A protein has these predicted regions:
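Short, structured motif recognition centered on aromatic/hydrophobic residues
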Residues: 1-12, 46-47, 91-107
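Residue-level detector of alpha-helical secondary structure
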Residues: 13-16, 25, 29-32, 36, ...
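N-terminal hydrophobic signal/anchor transmembrane helix of membrane proteins
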Residues: 35, 40-58, 143
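EF-hand and EF-hand-like helix-loop-helix modules
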Residues: 49, 123-124
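Terminal low-complexity "docking" segments
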Residues: 54-69
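Eukaryotic low-complexity, mixed-charge intrinsically disordered interaction/regulatory segments enriched
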Residues: 68-90
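Short, surface-exposed polybasic-aromatic patches that bind anionic ligands, especially phosphate groups
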Residues: 111, 115-121, 138
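Solvent-exposed beta-strand motifs enriched in subsets of small alpha/beta binding domains
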Residues: 125-132, 137-142
Length: 143
C-alpha cells in the first residue's frame, strides 16, 4: 500500500494468530498495525454473518460444501486455515474506507428480504463458470 505495508504478507501473518499463535505473538504481531477494539468488534460482526451464510450454504449443498475450507477458527490447524480465520486475516488488512464499504455491502445483503447470502452468490457464479446453470444442478453432479 502507500505506506509500505505488504498486505499479502500481513494477511497471512494475521491468520497465524490462530494457526501458529506463539510465532504470531513473537514474530508477526509486533510488526503489523494493531486494530482498534472498535474496528475488531465490527469485523467480528461481519465475520459472524459470513460464517452463518457459509454454514447455511453447506447445509443446503453438502456436496459442494465438502470442497470448501474448514468453516470455523476452532477447526484451524498449523497446516489448514478455516474460512473464518482467512476472512479475519483479510479484513484486518483493509483500510478503514475499504472496510466501511465492505461492511456496508454485507449489511445490505443481510438486511435484504430474503437475505442475499454472499457465499451462495459466489458459488453460483463459480459453478456457472464451470458450465452449470444452477447450484442444484452442480450439487447433483457431485459424486
Amino acid at each position: 500500500d502507500h505506506v509500505g505495508r505488504n498486505l499479502v504478507t500481513e494477511k497471512y501473518g494475521r491468520m497465524m494468530a490462530s494457526t501458529a499463535p506463539e510465532d504470531f505473538t513473537k514474530n508477526i504481531e509486533p510488526y503489523i498495525p494493531r486494530l482498534s477494539e472498535e474496528r475488531a468488534a465490527r469485523q467480528e460482526q461481519v465475520i459472524a454473518q459470513q460464517v452463518a451464510w457459509a454454514k447455511d450454504f453447506r447445509e443446503r449443498y453438502p456436496k459442494l460444501g465438502e470442497a470448501m475450507r474448514a468453516l470455523t477458527t476452532t477447526e484451524d490447524t498449523p497446516s489448514a486455515t478455516s474460512f473464518e480465520t482467512y476472512l479475519r486475516g483479510e479484513l484486518g488488512t483493509y483500510s478503514d474506507q475499504t472496510f466501511e464499504r465492505y461492511e456496508a455491502m454485507i449489511g445490505e445483503r443481510a438486511a435484504a428480504s430474503p437475505q442475499r447470502n454472499i457465499t451462495e452468490e459466489t458459488l453460483l457464479h463459480t459453478v456457472q463458470l464451470g458450465g452449470f446453470d444452477t447450484l442444484d444442478e452442480a450439487e447433483a453432479a457431485q459424486r
